[in-house]
Amino acid sequence: MSKSKTKTDKRNQSSLSRIKLSALHYCMSDAEPSIAYLQDNSAFINNEWHNLVLEKIFPVYNPSTEEDITQVSEKSQHDSTEEDITQVSEKSQHDDDKAVVDISERGRLLNILADLIERDRDILAAIEHLDNGKPFDEAYLLDLASVLKELRYTAGWADKLHGTLRFAITIPTFQDLRFLRYTRHEPVGVCGEIIPWNIPLLMYIWKIGPALAAGNTVVLKPEELTPLTALTVATLIKEAGFPPGVVNVVSGYGPTAGAACLSHKDNDKLAFTGSTLVGKVVMKAAAKSNLKKVTLELGGKSPMIVFIDADLDWAVENAHFGVFFNQGQCCIAQSRITVHESIYDEIVERDLEKAKKQVLGNPFESDTRYGPQILKIEFDSIPRLINSAKAEGAKVLCGGGRDDSCVGYYIQPTVFADVTDEMRIAKEEIFGPVITISRFKSVDEAIKRVDNTKYGLAAYVFTKDKAIRISAALKAGTVWVNCVHVASYQIPFGGNKNSGMGRELGEYGLE
C-alpha cells in the first residue's frame, strides 16, 4: 500500500512539474494572453484592450529574483479613452439589450468563466507565481481551486436573488381597501473594486463574482505590483461572452487610478481589500463624493489561544501553516499566539523545531513551501519591527532577519517568545513570517487580552471543551476552532472594529 502511494505521489509530482514548465514557457511567449501581450494592453474597457498614456509606465517584477518581468501603463484621472470607464459600465448596467440583465444568463456566463479559468489553470498559476512570488504548487493547488469553488458557488445564486410578495394587506383607514405589497432586489449599479497584492487572483473573484451574479457592472483596479492575473482573466471575461462594459479592468497606482475609482460620482458601490489606513481614505472618499455603499476588508492582528486541553501537535501544526502560509502575507494570519502557562514551554519548544524545518527557496521548485515577501517596502519594514521586539525584550528563538542565502525578498521564519502585550510586535500587523508567543493564566485573562486590540478580523481557539464559550466572547468577524484558514464559500467573511465593515462570501456577500 505504501509503495503504491509513493509511486502515485511521484507521478503526480512529475505531472505537476511538466505543467509548470509548459505554463512558464507559454507565459513568456508573445501569445495572447501572455505577459508580453499584456505589456501593450494595460486596460480592459468595454471588452477592448487599451494602451494608456505611455509616459506613465511602471514595472512588474518577480520578488523571488528581484528582476523586472514586464511593465504596464497606468490609468489616471487625466487619461483620455473612447469613453469614460465608469460611464461605459453604467451604460451597460441600464442597457436592456445586454444579456447580463437576464438572471439565468448571469449564472451561465459565470459558469463558462469558471470553465475557462479551469482550462487555463496552469497559465494563471504561473503568472500568479511570477508577479506574486508564491510557490507555483500553492497557486495551482490552493488558490486556483478556491477561485473555481467560489465562482461556481456564486453562479448558482444568480437566479435565486428575488424579493418577497405579500397579498391582501388591509388598511382600515382607507375604507378597508386591499393592497398588494412586494419587495424587489435590484442591482446596486456600478461597483468600483480595488484588490490587494497578497492573493490577487482569489480576491479578484471574491469581488467580481457576487457583483456579476447580482446583475451589477464592475470597474476593477488591481494592485499596481500584481496586475497580471487580473488583466489575464479579463481576456477570459470576453471569451466567456460577457457583454461589453460589464467588467472593466484598469491598472495604475492608488493615488491616481484608485482615487479616480473612489471619487467618481457614477460609481454606486466601493469594495476594497487592503490596509486599515487606506480603508479610512476609501470611507472619506465615499462620503465626499456621493455616499457610495462601502465594503471594507482591512487589516488584522489575529490571536490564537491554545488551552491546556488542546491537541498540542495539531495546534503547533496549524499555527505554522496559518502564520507562514503566503509568507505571513495574509490578513487573518494568527501571528499573536497565547498559550496556557502550564504548556507554554512545551509549545515554544515544538514551535521552534517546526520553524527550523521551513524550506525557503525558488518558489517554482516542488519542495519549496516558503517564498519571498512580495513587496520591497515590506521586505525593508519587517526587519525593523523584528528589531523593535528585540529591543523591547522579546526572545528570538529562530530567524530574526533577512535570509541572505537566497536572491529575492526573503525573510527568515521567525519565532519570538516572552512577548508582552505592550510590545509593538504584539500590537501592529506584521504581514510577514513572524510568530509571537505569550502566556496566560486563566480563561478570562486570555479573552480580555486577545480582545485588547483595534483589530477584529479573525481569531483561533484550540480546545476540547471551551469552544462555544470562548468563540462567543471574542470580538472577531470569524472564529476558527481547532483549525485555521478553512474556507467555506457559503459562510460570510469580514471584520469588526478597524478590520473593516460589511461581509463578503455566502448569501450575505451578495446582499
From Swiss-Prot:
Which residues are listed for NAD(+) binding in this entry? G274, S275, T276, L277, V278, G279
Catalysed transformations (reactions): an aldehyde + NAD(+) + H2O = a carboxylate + NADH + 2 H(+)
The alphabetized UniProt keywords are: Mitochondrion, NAD, Oxidoreductase, Transit peptide
InterPro entries referenced in this protein's UniProt entry, alphabetically? Ald_DH/histidinol_DH (IPR016161), Ald_DH_C (IPR016163), Ald_DH_CS_CYS (IPR016160), Ald_DH_CS_GLU (IPR029510), Ald_DH_N (IPR016162), Aldehyde_DH_dom (IPR015590), Aldehyde_DH_NAD(P) (IPR012394)
Segment annotated as transit peptide = 1-21
Record Gene3D superfamilies:
Aldehyde Dehydrogenase, Chain A, domain 1 (3.40.605.10), Aldehyde Dehydrogenase, Chain A, domain 2 (3.40.309.10)
EC number(s) recorded for this UniProt protein: 1.2.1.3
SUPFAM superfamilies linked: ALDH-like
Q: Name one GO cellular component term.
A: mitochondrial matrix
Give the PANTHER family listed for this entry. ALDEHYDE DEHYDROGENASE-RELATED (PTHR11699)
Question: In its UniProt entry, what is this protein called?
Answer: Aldehyde dehydrogenase 2, mitochondrial
Record gene name: ALD2
